[in-house]
Structure formats: C-alpha cells, structure tokens
Amino acid sequence: MTVVVISGPPGSGKSTVAKKLASELGLRFVSAGSVFRKLAEEIGVSLLELNEMALKDPEIDLRIDRMVLEEARRGNVVIEAHLGGWVAAPYADVNVYLTAPLEERAKRIARRDGISYEEALEEILSREEVQWIRFRKLYGFDVASLEIFDLVVNTALMGPEAVVETIKRMLL
C-alpha cells in the first residue's frame, strides 16, 4: 500500500515528478492542485480569487484535505498537493518537498500557462502570500517549516528523472 506525497510551492515541479513517479511505479496519481484549479473554473474565478475566498471559507481547503486523506488511506498512490506533506504525513511512506528559486518557478508557470514572466511572478507572489496566511490561520503551521519531510529537493539543481530515481530508492 505505497503512498508517496509530493508537496511544494507553485512551479516547483510537483505535478511533473508525481506523474512520472506514479507511471513508473504503476501507482494512481492524484493532484490536489488540479482539484483546486477545477473548482476555480467551475465557479468562474481565478486561482488567486479562489485563494482569497478560501481565507473566508475554510470549507474549501477542508474539502480538498478530505480528498487527499481519503486517497492516502486507499494507498497505492502518488499524491501531489501543496499541503499534502502536512495533511497526509501519517500515511506517507515517503514525504517529499520540491522547491526551486522564485525566478525559475515563474519561468515554468509562464511556459505552462502561456503567460508572461511578469504575470507568472505576480501570480506566484500573490498566491503564496494569501496561502501562507490561510494555512497558518486554518492549520496553525508554518509552510516554511520543512522538518516533516523525508526528502527536500531544489528542482533547479536536479531534474525530474533524478528526483524520481531518488524517491524510488527511498521506497526500497
């Protein structure tokens, strides 16, 4: 019942690594970020607007947390979730945090979303500011504290293939 949780800020490579790892290990892939993006689309707001709405309505985050926990309990899954490392830690065989310098993350998001570097940078800074406030208020923890993770990787220094191989070795 393997459970790998991959957390990190926007643009850190969570989805890329999680999808590749799930594929190579024959595990299910679950993305809390995709659920959050889908919810924003469904109600017709931007990610930043949904983040701001979640400040006032904790049920938005709790709904995603319940989904992450249920998937972790089912096992045989790679979960990609900004807060997954904190929420699903008791179920994780390997708890991974990916990061990269802000400039690199902005370049990745600009490429992924087809927006300018400046727009991506502004989006990241706005989202992270709201998220940090929201997460501290709702959960009482500091997302900058990484002690709970088994592996912390700067993905600007290590590509997705190397990260996947490192995680696979940790599962042996």
UniProtKB/Swiss-Prot annotation:
* Superkingdom of source: Archaea
Q: Does the keyword RNA-binding apply?
A: no
Q: Which GO terms describe its biological process?
A: pyrimidine nucleotide metabolic process
Identify the GO cellular component terms for this protein.
Answer: cytoplasm
Please provide the record's keywords in A-Z order. Answer: ATP-binding, Cytoplasm, Kinase, Nucleotide-binding, Transferase
Identify the EC number(s).
2.7.4.25
Where does this polypeptide localize? Cytoplasm
What's the protein name? Cytidylate kinase
